[in-house]
Amino acid sequence: MEEKGREILREAASEQGYTSIAINKDGKHVGGCFIPWKLTSSAINMKTPRVTLAVEDLQDEAIMADVKKCKVLGCYIMIPLEDYSFVQQFHELCDLFILYGKNISDLSFVQDMPNLFLFYLEDAKLTDIRPLIDNCRRSNSLTGKRFGFYHCEIQDTSAMKDADFMISELLIWPPEGQTDEKERWLNGRHISGFRIYD
Protein backbone atom coordinates (compact mmCIF):
# COMPACT_ATOMS: atom_id res chain seq x y z
CA MET A 1 0.00 0.00 0.00
CA GLU A 2 1.28 3.44 -0.85
CA GLU A 3 1.94 5.77 2.09
CA LYS A 4 -0.66 8.32 1.00
CA GLY A 5 -3.27 5.57 0.87
CA ARG A 6 -2.23 4.43 4.33
CA GLU A 7 -2.75 7.96 5.66
CA ILE A 8 -6.20 8.16 4.06
CA LEU A 9 -7.11 4.79 5.58
CA ARG A 10 -5.88 5.81 9.05
CA GLU A 11 -7.94 9.00 8.89
CA ALA A 12 -11.08 7.18 7.74
CA ALA A 13 -10.58 4.57 10.47
CA SER A 14 -10.15 7.21 13.18
CA GLU A 15 -13.43 8.81 12.12
CA GLN A 16 -15.09 5.44 11.45
CA GLY A 17 -15.95 7.06 8.15
CA TYR A 18 -16.96 5.92 4.71
CA THR A 19 -14.38 4.77 2.21
CA SER A 20 -13.92 2.43 -0.72
CA ILE A 21 -11.05 0.11 -1.47
CA ALA A 22 -9.37 -1.51 -4.43
CA ILE A 23 -7.16 -4.56 -4.16
CA ASN A 24 -4.39 -5.24 -6.65
CA LYS A 25 -1.01 -6.93 -6.74
CA ASP A 26 1.25 -4.07 -5.70
CA GLY A 27 -0.99 -1.61 -3.85
CA LYS A 28 -0.39 1.21 -6.34
CA HIS A 29 -3.33 3.57 -6.38
CA VAL A 30 -6.21 2.69 -8.69
CA GLY A 31 -8.12 5.79 -9.73
CA GLY A 32 -11.21 3.90 -10.85
CA CYS A 33 -12.43 0.96 -12.84
CA PHE A 34 -14.60 0.47 -15.86
CA ILE A 35 -18.31 0.85 -15.24
CA PRO A 36 -20.36 -1.83 -16.99
CA TRP A 37 -23.73 -0.28 -16.20
CA LYS A 38 -25.63 1.48 -18.95
CA LEU A 39 -27.20 3.87 -16.46
CA THR A 40 -24.09 5.12 -14.72
CA SER A 41 -25.85 7.79 -12.68
CA SER A 42 -26.22 5.25 -9.89
CA ALA A 43 -22.66 3.96 -10.12
CA ILE A 44 -20.84 4.99 -6.97
CA ASN A 45 -17.43 3.99 -8.31
CA MET A 46 -16.94 7.04 -10.53
CA LYS A 47 -14.62 8.79 -8.05
CA THR A 48 -13.47 5.81 -6.07
CA PRO A 49 -11.64 3.79 -4.81
CA ARG A 50 -9.95 6.03 -2.28
CA VAL A 51 -7.57 3.41 -0.91
CA THR A 52 -5.72 0.64 -2.77
CA LEU A 53 -4.47 -2.41 -0.90
CA ALA A 54 -1.85 -4.85 -2.11
CA VAL A 55 -2.71 -8.54 -1.82
CA GLU A 56 -0.21 -8.84 1.05
CA ASP A 57 -2.03 -6.06 2.94
CA LEU A 58 -4.96 -8.46 3.45
CA GLN A 59 -2.67 -10.34 5.87
CA ASP A 60 -1.49 -7.18 7.68
CA GLU A 61 -3.33 -7.02 11.02
CA ALA A 62 -2.92 -3.26 11.48
CA ILE A 63 -4.16 -2.42 7.99
CA MET A 64 -7.12 -4.80 8.20
CA ALA A 65 -8.00 -3.49 11.67
CA ASP A 66 -8.25 -0.01 10.15
CA VAL A 67 -10.31 -1.32 7.23
CA LYS A 68 -12.73 -2.94 9.71
CA LYS A 69 -13.24 0.41 11.46
CA CYS A 70 -14.38 2.01 8.19
CA LYS A 71 -17.74 1.82 6.50
CA VAL A 72 -16.63 0.33 3.17
CA LEU A 73 -19.07 1.35 0.42
CA GLY A 74 -17.18 -0.04 -2.58
CA CYS A 75 -14.77 -2.95 -2.98
CA TYR A 76 -12.97 -3.38 -6.32
CA ILE A 77 -10.86 -6.53 -6.54
CA MET A 78 -8.51 -6.37 -9.52
CA ILE A 79 -6.55 -9.61 -9.05
CA PRO A 80 -7.41 -13.26 -8.38
CA LEU A 81 -7.53 -14.07 -4.67
CA GLU A 82 -7.55 -17.41 -2.91
CA ASP A 83 -10.04 -16.28 -0.28
CA TYR A 84 -12.82 -13.70 -0.52
CA SER A 85 -14.33 -14.24 2.93
CA PHE A 86 -12.95 -10.92 4.24
CA VAL A 87 -15.65 -9.18 2.17
CA GLN A 88 -18.26 -10.43 4.67
CA GLN A 89 -17.19 -7.77 7.15
CA PHE A 90 -18.26 -4.93 4.81
CA HIS A 91 -21.87 -4.59 5.97
CA GLU A 92 -22.27 -1.13 4.39
CA LEU A 93 -21.11 -2.35 0.97
CA CYS A 94 -23.03 -0.96 -2.02
CA ASP A 95 -20.72 -1.94 -4.88
CA LEU A 96 -18.78 -5.20 -5.21
CA PHE A 97 -16.66 -5.49 -8.36
CA ILE A 98 -14.52 -8.61 -8.87
CA LEU A 99 -12.20 -9.13 -11.83
CA TYR A 100 -10.47 -12.49 -12.38
CA GLY A 101 -12.74 -14.39 -10.00
CA LYS A 102 -11.54 -17.77 -11.23
CA ASN A 103 -11.10 -19.06 -7.68
CA ILE A 104 -14.71 -18.32 -6.71
CA SER A 105 -16.94 -21.38 -6.59
CA ASP A 106 -19.73 -20.00 -4.41
CA LEU A 107 -21.04 -16.63 -3.25
CA SER A 108 -21.28 -17.44 0.46
CA PHE A 109 -19.20 -14.33 1.21
CA VAL A 110 -22.12 -12.18 -0.03
CA GLN A 111 -24.24 -11.93 3.10
CA ASP A 112 -25.41 -9.32 5.58
CA MET A 113 -24.91 -6.55 3.00
CA PRO A 114 -28.33 -4.86 2.97
CA ASN A 115 -27.12 -1.93 0.84
CA LEU A 116 -25.51 -3.97 -1.95
CA PHE A 117 -27.01 -2.96 -5.29
CA LEU A 118 -24.08 -3.20 -7.74
CA PHE A 119 -22.51 -6.63 -8.21
CA TYR A 120 -20.07 -7.48 -11.02
CA LEU A 121 -18.17 -10.76 -11.27
CA GLU A 122 -15.80 -12.24 -13.87
CA ASP A 123 -14.65 -15.77 -14.64
CA ALA A 124 -16.22 -17.59 -11.67
CA LYS A 125 -17.52 -21.16 -11.72
CA LEU A 126 -20.57 -21.17 -9.48
CA THR A 127 -23.06 -23.82 -8.47
CA ASP A 128 -25.74 -21.17 -8.06
CA ILE A 129 -26.39 -17.52 -7.16
CA ARG A 130 -28.66 -18.18 -4.16
CA PRO A 131 -26.52 -16.25 -1.59
CA LEU A 132 -26.61 -13.10 -3.76
CA ILE A 133 -30.37 -13.32 -4.31
CA ASP A 134 -31.07 -14.06 -0.63
CA ASN A 135 -28.88 -11.15 0.45
CA CYS A 136 -30.75 -8.75 -1.84
CA ARG A 137 -34.13 -10.11 -0.70
CA ARG A 138 -33.29 -9.08 2.87
CA SER A 139 -32.54 -5.53 1.75
CA ASN A 140 -34.81 -2.68 2.77
CA SER A 141 -33.46 -0.52 -0.05
CA LEU A 142 -35.72 0.36 -2.95
CA THR A 143 -32.70 0.94 -5.18
CA GLY A 144 -32.81 -1.24 -8.28
CA LYS A 145 -30.11 -3.89 -8.27
CA ARG A 146 -27.56 -4.25 -11.06
CA PHE A 147 -25.86 -7.61 -11.65
CA GLY A 148 -23.15 -8.37 -14.19
CA PHE A 149 -21.65 -11.80 -14.87
CA TYR A 150 -18.76 -11.92 -17.34
CA HIS A 151 -17.77 -15.39 -18.58
CA CYS A 152 -19.11 -16.99 -15.40
CA GLU A 153 -20.15 -20.62 -15.53
CA ILE A 154 -23.25 -20.82 -13.36
CA GLN A 155 -24.96 -24.20 -13.15
CA ASP A 156 -28.25 -23.11 -11.58
CA THR A 157 -29.91 -19.71 -12.00
CA SER A 158 -33.30 -20.77 -10.60
CA ALA A 159 -32.82 -18.48 -7.58
CA MET A 160 -33.80 -15.65 -9.93
CA LYS A 161 -37.41 -16.84 -9.54
CA ASP A 162 -37.23 -15.71 -5.92
CA ALA A 163 -35.86 -12.26 -6.73
CA ASP A 164 -38.77 -10.23 -5.36
CA PHE A 165 -36.85 -6.97 -5.69
CA MET A 166 -36.29 -4.60 -8.60
CA ILE A 167 -33.48 -5.53 -10.97
CA SER A 168 -32.57 -2.50 -13.06
CA GLU A 169 -29.85 -4.20 -15.08
CA LEU A 170 -28.78 -7.78 -15.63
CA LEU A 171 -25.75 -8.09 -17.89
CA ILE A 172 -24.56 -11.49 -19.06
CA TRP A 173 -21.45 -12.27 -21.07
CA PRO A 174 -21.89 -16.05 -21.41
CA PRO A 175 -18.98 -18.46 -21.59
CA GLU A 176 -18.26 -19.68 -25.08
CA GLY A 177 -20.78 -22.26 -26.22
CA GLN A 178 -23.63 -21.38 -23.87
CA THR A 179 -26.69 -20.43 -25.89
CA ASP A 180 -29.69 -20.70 -23.56
CA GLU A 181 -28.84 -17.75 -21.32
CA LYS A 182 -32.00 -15.70 -21.86
CA GLU A 183 -34.31 -18.49 -20.71
CA ARG A 184 -32.03 -19.49 -17.84
CA TRP A 185 -31.81 -15.99 -16.40
CA LEU A 186 -35.23 -14.50 -17.00
CA ASN A 187 -37.36 -17.45 -15.88
CA GLY A 188 -40.47 -15.71 -17.17
CA ARG A 189 -39.57 -12.33 -15.63
CA HIS A 190 -39.28 -9.06 -17.48
CA ILE A 191 -36.11 -7.11 -16.73
CA SER A 192 -35.89 -3.93 -18.77
CA GLY A 193 -32.11 -3.74 -18.53
CA PHE A 194 -31.40 -7.35 -19.53
CA ARG A 195 -28.58 -7.69 -22.05
CA ILE A 196 -26.58 -10.65 -23.32
CA TYR A 197 -23.23 -10.02 -24.96
CA ASP A 198 -22.12 -12.82 -27.28
Which ranges hold each PLM region?
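Short intrinsically disordered terminal tails
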Residues: 1-2
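Concave beta-strand-loop units of leucine-rich repeat
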Residues: 14-63, 69-82, 86, 92-105, ...
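Extreme N-terminal leader/targeting regions
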Residues: 5-9
